């Protein structure tokens, strides 16, 4: 019987595969976020006309999902392997199935289903056509073709493939609890993450200072606006991410009512939309440097008319 891939070998295998498909291997972005989609390597690069192909691991924090390390599948923080390709290759689904084969999962021997599940992120004004990918009855991946990001229509279309690494590793290693996943030879997932899971859950549900978080949200929102007034897209987006994580902490703590919740989401969305518009304008001002010469000249000429 062949040795099962460790968690880090799964990551390395996916990195090698998508590198061979022309993706840049980016590193995780250093701000808290609820999903890999919120990284600027996806959110910002999915808009505008320039091509973009990237793959990266993104630790994703969802305070309300914390379970003190007691639930085998529900986590405060999990890991996503994110692939974004713009324009979307026509064979992206075939490439995805090929990536599973590299992980030792033969599509001909397993029940792999693409289940329609259109995607929406209200807090960033983003949406797209999507599918969940189910492997023998368990969701392991989300497929999305972005239609709108930051309130802007996308073009060319960006394809996003988001692997749930813990679920994928649980399946490959045949374990029932994420904490039993072998991260590296001789080191289990739980030995690294179960204590942080407990502590972050306790903080999110019991200890966090609600007044401080409320004040921080207002301060982060204001600072994002100040950065945008100066045309500073990336610092502004950092503060949008801080607003989002602060809201998630408030939500986990039960500190916002249903009505207030909608208001906070709208405030984050409004900032994200301004960031998106400012980013597109910035790339145009820079002359769309990632476009080939012919396409760039044509597009800039059209914009000048």
Curated annotation (Swiss-Prot):
Q: Which domain of life is it from?
A: Bacteria
Keyword Ligase set for record: yes
Enzyme nomenclature, EC number: 6.1.1.14
Q: Read off the InterPro entries from this record.
A: aa-tRNA-synth_II/BPL/LPL (IPR045864), Gly-tRNA-synth_heterodimer (IPR006194), Gly-tRNA_ligase_asu (IPR002310)
Indicate whether Protein biosynthesis appears among the record's keywords. Answer: yes
- Alphabetized UniProt keyword annotations: Aminoacyl-tRNA synthetase, ATP-binding, Cytoplasm, Ligase, Nucleotide-binding, Protein biosynthesis
Which PROSITE patterns does this UniProt record tie to the protein? AA_TRNA_LIGASE_II_GLYAB
**Gene Ontology MF terms in the entry:** ATP binding; catalytic activity, acting on a protein; glycine-tRNA ligase activity; transferase activity
Cysteine pairs bridged by disulfides in the record: none
Q: Which BP terms in the Gene Ontology apply to this protein?
A: glycyl-tRNA aminoacylation
* GO annotation, cellular component aspect: cytosol
Spell out the reaction equation it catalyses: tRNA(Gly) + glycine + ATP = glycyl-tRNA(Gly) + AMP + diphosphate
Q: Name one Pfam family in it.
A: tRNA-synt_2e
Main location, first listed in the record = cytoplasm
Tell me the compartments it is located in: Cytoplasm
Which PANTHER family does its entry note? GLYCINE--TRNA LIGASE, CHLOROPLASTIC_MITOCHONDRIAL 2, GLYCYL-TRNA SYNTHETASE
Q: HAMAP family per the record?
A: Gly_tRNA_synth_alpha
| Record note on quaternary structure | Tetramer of two alpha and two beta subunits.
Q: Which family does it belong to?
A: Belongs to the class-II aminoacyl-tRNA synthetase family.
Protein name stated in the entry:
Glycine--tRNA ligase alpha subunit
The source organism is Streptococcus pneumoniae (strain CGSP14)
């Amino acid at each position: 019987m062949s040795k099962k891939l460790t968690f880090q070998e799964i990551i390395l295998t996916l990195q090698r595969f998508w590198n061979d498909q022309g993706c840049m291997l980016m590193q995780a972005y250093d701000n808290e976020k609820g999903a890999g989609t919120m990284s600027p390597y996806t959110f910002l690069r999915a808009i505008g006309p320039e091509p973009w192909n990237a793959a990266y691991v993104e630790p994703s924090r969802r305070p309300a999902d914390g379970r003190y390390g007691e639930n085998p599948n529900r986590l405060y923080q999990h890991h996503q392997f994110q692939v974004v390709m713009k324009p979307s290759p026509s064979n992206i689904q075939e490439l995805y199935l090929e990536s599973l084969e590299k992980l030792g999962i033969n599509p001909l021997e397993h029940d792999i289903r693409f289940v329609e599940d259109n995607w929406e992120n209200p807090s960033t004004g983003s949406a797209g056509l999507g599918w969940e990918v189910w492997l023998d009855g368990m969701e392991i991946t989300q497929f999305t073709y972005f239609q709108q990001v930051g309130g802007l229509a996308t073009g060319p279309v960006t394809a996003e493939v988001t692997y749930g690494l813990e679920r994928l590793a649980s399946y490959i290693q045949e374990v029932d609890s994420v904490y039993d996943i072998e991260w590296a030879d001789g080191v289990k997932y739980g030995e690294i993450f179960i204590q942080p899971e407990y502590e972050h859950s306790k903080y999110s549900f019991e200890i966090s200072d609600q007044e401080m978080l409320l004040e921080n949200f207002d301060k982060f929102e204001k600072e994002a606006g100040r950065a945008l007034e100066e045309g500073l897209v990336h610092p502004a987006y950092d503060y949008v991410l801080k607003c989002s994580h602060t809201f998630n902490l408030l939500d986990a703590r039960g500190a916002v009512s249903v009505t207030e919740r909608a208001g906070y989401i709208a405030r984050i969305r409004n900032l994200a939309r301004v960031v998106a518009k400012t980013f597109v304008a910035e790339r145009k001002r820079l002359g769309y440097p990632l476009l080939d010469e012919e396409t760039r000249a044509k597009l800039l000429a059209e914009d000048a008319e």
